[in-house]
């Protein structure tokens, strides 16, 4: 069984961050923690989700950096990975009725107030906009092109999608369905087939692919247990 537990409890301790970047990380971490205290967010999309995504991202980042060194590829930007992970669900349209401009205002303001430039804030915004699963389904080529420009996006994408599968993903799926009140238990099981089990094939990094394989297998095993216990599904009239 893979051992992928993130060792960076404090993201500001990630190697190679400058003093200024460490300060920025701490400010954005605090901003995000406060932001997700709003009761509109349920347990499927809360600060604990953000922390898990951040942990996944740093685990993948470390492995990707090692691989890039071996292949003499350009270095990645740890700050972009960290901020992208922390901010990826700010003004999520599933919870907040805002325009894209409204999201940009919130994200960019937070990054600028944390000590970064307007141009870098726009860079982080572009990364965050590319994380969305629905956006990739609508225009996969755009996301592919964006990852070519911002390779850190692939890491944050994988990190977020990993939290949608495995044991955590199962819990989050049922939690979201219950919180929104529009999805039955059987509908949630169907969601595993319709979306969650497809995420493994959408991973961008080698580390993400390996982690997704194990977590997807856990969903498949759970679905076997569900069918054993629930019996045949009877369609309602």
Regions found by a protein language model. Name each.
Residues 2-20, 39-47, 51-74, 87, ...:
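Divalent metal-dependent phosphate-bond-processing catalytic cores, especially two-metal-ion Mg2+/Mn2+ enzymes
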Residues 53, 101-113:
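An active-site-proximal "capping" alpha-helix that borders the catalytic cofactor pocket
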Residues 58, 87, 91, 107-112:
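Amphipathic alpha-helical segments within well-ordered protein domains
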Residues 74-96, 103, 125-134:
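His-Asp-centered metal-binding catalytic motifs of divalent-metal-dependent phosphohydrolases/nucleases
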Residues 96-100, 167-168:
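Conserved strand-to-helix beginnings and helix N-cap segments that scaffold or border functional pockets
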Residues 117-124:
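Membrane-interface starts of transmembrane alpha-helices
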């Amino acid at each position: 069984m893979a051992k992928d537990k993130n060792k960076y409890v404090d993201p500001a301790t990630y190697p190679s961050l400058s003093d200024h970047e460490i300060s920025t990380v701490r400010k954005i971490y605090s901003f995000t923690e406060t932001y997700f205290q709003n009761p509109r967010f349920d347990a499927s999309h809360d600060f604990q989700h953000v922390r898990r995504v951040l942990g996944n991202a740093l685990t993948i980042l470390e492995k990707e950096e090692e691989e890039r060194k071996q292949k003499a590829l350009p270095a990645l930007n740890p700050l972009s990975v960290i901020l992208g992970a922390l901010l990826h669900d700010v003004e999520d349209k599933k919870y907040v009725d805002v325009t894209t401009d409204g999201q940009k205002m919130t994200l960019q303001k937070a990054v600028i107030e944390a000590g970064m430039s307007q141009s870098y804030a726009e860079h982080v915004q572009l990364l965050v906009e590319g994380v969305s699963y629905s956006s990739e389904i609508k225009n996969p080529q755009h996301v592919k092109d964006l990852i070519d420009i911002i390779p850190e996006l692939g890491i944050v994408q994988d990190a977020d999608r990993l939290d949608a599968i495995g044991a955590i993903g199962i819990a989050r799926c049922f939690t979201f369905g219950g919180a929104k009140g529009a999805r039955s238990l059987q509908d949630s099981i169907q969601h595993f087939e319709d979306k969650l089990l497809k995420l493994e094939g959408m991973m961008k990094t080698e580390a993400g692919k390996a982690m997704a394989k194990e977590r997807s297998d856990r969903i498949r095993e759970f679905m076997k247990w569900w069918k054993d216990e629930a019996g045949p599904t009877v369609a309602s009239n």
